[in-house]
Every structure is written in C-alpha cells, then in structure tokens.
A protein has these predicted regions:
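Strand-loop microenvironment adjacent to phosphate/nucleotide-handling motifs in alpha/beta enzyme folds
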Residues: 1-224
C-alpha cells in the first residue's frame, strides 16, 4: 500500500527536499526488523467503532505493541477489551501496572487511570489529577510514548470531542515520531482530530478504513 500525497500534511519544519509533499523514503533494516516499536491510539466519543475498524484491519503478526486510551465512564467496569478482542486476531488486554509492552498485543487503559509507557517498555497506571477534564489522558500517553520511544513511535488521534491529544502529538513530533489523524468525513466527532490537525504536526489525515493499512505500511518502512 502506498500512502497517497493527498493525505500528506506538510509541516513548516519539513526539510526543503520534501516540498513535493512526502518525506524521503526510509527503508527497513536489512534484518527486516520493523521500523517502529509502538502505536498509541486515542479515541473518545464514537471511538469504539473506530478502534474496532483499525484493529480488525491489522494482521495477526503485526509487529508493534499497541497502547490505547479510550475515554470511558469512570464509575463502571469496562468491557472494551472483551469487545475489541472479538474484532481482531491480536491479543487485547486491559493494562495493569507493571505490564510490559508486547508485540501483537493491544494494551488498553482502564477506566479512570492514566496509562504511561516507561523507557524500559513497562506500563504504569496513575490516578493523578485529570488532564483537560479527562482521565485517562491521551496527552499523557503520547508524551510518555514520545519520551520512551522517540522516532520509533506512531500516535493516532481518532474521533472524539474536546482537544485531548493536541499537546501530546506535538511531543511525538518533536521526538521524531509520526502522527496520524482521522479525517472529518469518517469521524463521528471531529473535535480531537481537528485539534491535532491545527497543531500542524499531523503527517497523515486518513479515513478510518485506511488507517490500519497505513500502519502496516509504516512499520515495513515503505513510506513515512
């Protein structure tokens, strides 16, 4: 799959040789190792369907670890891991403090806890204060992923109200990572993707049915 230029959003910070709209091709290593380590997904209102569409489109051998923040009602038990596990061949689990990131695995933030990724690949849960009125916070997840994995991280902002994720995508971009936002046409609510796009750090704006394929392509190093 090739990511079409019409989806590429050029940042003012891009080097001059990307004026055509696509950054230079970065090739996978000779060993065939994936070009990225982790994908961080953020969703809010309308997000369950969007997350399901992405995970359903990823192959069983997708090499990356996936971490997810979905804004949830904090006072009730979450069944999101059970629901999403029926949509994908990947392993899906609710994250626990001290878990270690695993390839082919989706780690979902539990209700009312921030999910953080540490440099050693372990996960931490925090009940610290709300960030922009939400817990778990996509901003905190993205910032921790950026600090831990730098240019080997991809952040994806999906449907949702508000502006969670807008600060975090800037951290991802600052450390050399890649940012994807769901397009307006396929978003049930465009608040969060729109806020991310306004930061001018988004690399690709894609309809929901193209995001899984884009992730596979990026991990292969075929386009970035």
């Amino acid at each position: 799959m090739a990511l079409e230029e019409r989806h590429r959003i050029r940042s003012p910070s891009d080097p001059p040789d990307t004026a055509a709209g696509v950054r230079p091709l970065r090739l996978a290593s000779a060993s065939g190792a994936p070009f990225y380590d982790v994908v961080a997904l953020l969703a809010s209102a309308g997000g369950l369907s969007a997350l399901g569409a992405i995970l359903a489109g990823l192959p069983e051998d997708f090499p990356g670890a996936i971490v997810v923040v979905q804004h949830l009602e904090p006072r009730h038990r979450s069944f999101i891991a059970d629901i999403l596990s029926r949509r994908t061949k990947l392993r899906v689990k609710e994250a626990q403090d001290g878990d270690r990131l695993q390839p082919h695995t989706v780690h979902i933030a539990p209700p009312d806890y921030h999910l953080l990724v540490n440099p050693d690949g372990t996960l931490s849960l925090s009940h610290s204060e709300l960030v922009h009125f939400v817990r778990p916070s996509g901003d905190l997840l993205f910032e921790s992923v950026a600090a831990s994995f730098k240019d080997r991280a991809i952040a994806v902002v999906l449907t949702g109200t508000g502006s969670d994720g807008a600060m975090g995508v800037q951290a991802i971009k600052k450390m050399g990572g890649t940012v994807i936002a769901q397009d307006e046409g396929s978003s049930e609510f465009f608040g969060m993707p729109g806020a991310a796009i306004k930061t001018r750090t988004v690399d690709f704006i894609l309809p929901i049915d193209e995001i899984a394929g884009a992730l596979v392509t990026l991990f292969k190093g075929e386009a970035a």
